[in-house]
Amino acid sequence: MITNTAAYQFAPIHDPQQLADSVLERAQQRALKGSVLVAEEGINLFLAGDAEQIASFYAWLHADARFAQMRVKYSHSAEQPFARLKVKVKPEIISFRRDDASPLQGRAPSVAPAVLRKWMQQGHDDHGRPLVLLDTRNAQEVAYGTFQGALTLPIDKFTELPEALQPHRAALADATVVSFCTGGIRCEKAALWMHAEGMDNVLQLEGGILGYFEDVGGEGYDGRCFVFDERVALDAELRPLVDGAACADAGKI
């Protein structure tokens, strides 16, 4: 059984290459595979391997004060979903190219999965404001599933979101907007940018879709959540669509 993890943390990294080298060394020692991006703004990890080795790696990373509060999201598969280990230094851990959306200057307010589930059941937030769920992912991902009634955008990459959102701004003015994505990293930057643009009633979904599945299940969500590895997508119980030879409905959305 393979333990799969997704985690990120925005934090000032003064020497990204040094951190990347340390991560690579310790992940290799534990025979982990996956993808890690390091930048001056933080770290973004998708790693998979033996459960004990995964626990040891994250114990090492959590011992660094910059990552002590980093949430790790877990799922399992019979097969290793990554072919190799890649650790790279990039300008951003998720490319957005907006100076007015830096998480190092402060986080956007968030909403917990259980609270969002309650709001969806009510049809409004706790103040009676209408609720709009904003999917910040690209069209390929959305095709596998999204929250019921979510506002989706015809984008192929995250950097296209600001322009694609412009026609909807007036309709969002009187609503409480909850931005969401796979694991939280894109919706965090999107929420910050929206606040910088004067859209004050914007929250990010804490932990993203995977955090929602992990905490409260799939209520209010239709379909699966696309992931960028050989599993292709996960259902609300975090089971992979494709898992080596064991892949019922493989390739189906």
UniProtKB/Swiss-Prot annotation:
Rhodanese domain location: 127-221
Residues at the catalytic site: 181
Keywords attached to this entry: Oxidoreductase, tRNA processing
GO biological process: tRNA modification
Entry's EC annotation: 1.14.-.-
Family membership noted in the UniProt record: Belongs to the TrhO family.
Name of this protein: tRNA uridine(34) hydroxylase
Organism: Xanthomonas campestris pv. campestris (strain ATCC 33913 / DSM 3586 / NCPPB 528 / LMG 568 / P 25)
Taxonomic lineage from the root: Bacteria, Pseudomonadati, Pseudomonadota, Gammaproteobacteria, Lysobacterales
